[in-house]
């Protein structure tokens, strides 16, 4: 579960290392973000010479959450960290590589480019 002020690790090569969630998109009453939700975030830590700079406001999609969640088949899955991938206005990733596993739920949310770049889909 991701909410306002949650810090997430960035799982791509845009140059950002850590982002802070400003808002979970999807309506005025949405409090928590789950895997596949789009958030607005601020870059808190970045590498020099990257595509995004510290302080920049970006859109990102959540790809991993530390809080376990159930799937329709009855199984549960959780990850070691909260992570996101920075995306553009067209919902395509701004980076060219994805690091670490991503959740299968991204396929249902039509983030096929992230699925194809990811080394592992769980």
Swiss-Prot record:
GO cellular component: cytosolic large ribosomal subunit
Gene3D superfamilies with a match to the protein in the record: Ribosomal protein L14 (2.40.150.20)
Gene Ontology molecular function terms on file: large ribosomal subunit rRNA binding; structural constituent of ribosome
Superkingdom of this protein's organism: Bacteria
One GO biological process term: translation
One Pfam family from the record: Ribosomal_L14
Keywords attached to this entry: Ribonucleoprotein, Ribosomal protein, RNA-binding, rRNA-binding
Similarity comment: family membership: Belongs to the universal ribosomal protein uL14 family.
Subunit structure: Part of the 50S ribosomal subunit. Forms a cluster with proteins L3 and L19. In the 70S ribosome, L14 and L19 interact and together make contacts with the 16S rRNA in bridges B5 and B8.
Family annotation (PANTHER family): 50S/60S RIBOSOMAL PROTEIN L14/L23 (PTHR11761), LARGE RIBOSOMAL SUBUNIT PROTEIN UL14M (PTHR11761:SF3)
Role, per record: Binds to 23S rRNA. Forms part of two intersubunit bridges in the 70S ribosome.
Protein name: Large ribosomal subunit protein uL14
Lineage of source species: Bacteria, Bacillati, Chloroflexota, Chloroflexia, Chloroflexales
């Amino acid at each position: 579960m991701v909410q306002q002020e949650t810090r997430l690790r960035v799982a791509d090569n845009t140059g950002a290392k850590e982002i802070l969630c400003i808002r979970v998109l999807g309506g005025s009453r949405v409090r928590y973000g789950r895997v596949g939700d789009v958030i607005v975030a601020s870059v808190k830590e970045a590498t020099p010479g990257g595509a995004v700079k510290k302080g920049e406001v970006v859109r990102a999609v959540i790809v991993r959450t530390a809080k376990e969640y159930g799937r329709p088949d009855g199984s549960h899955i959780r990850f070691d960290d909260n992570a996101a991938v920075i995306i553009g206005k067209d919902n395509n990733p701004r980076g060219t590589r994805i690091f670490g596993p991503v959740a299968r739920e991204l396929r249902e949310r039509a983030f096929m480019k992230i699925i194809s770049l990811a080394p592992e889909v769980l």
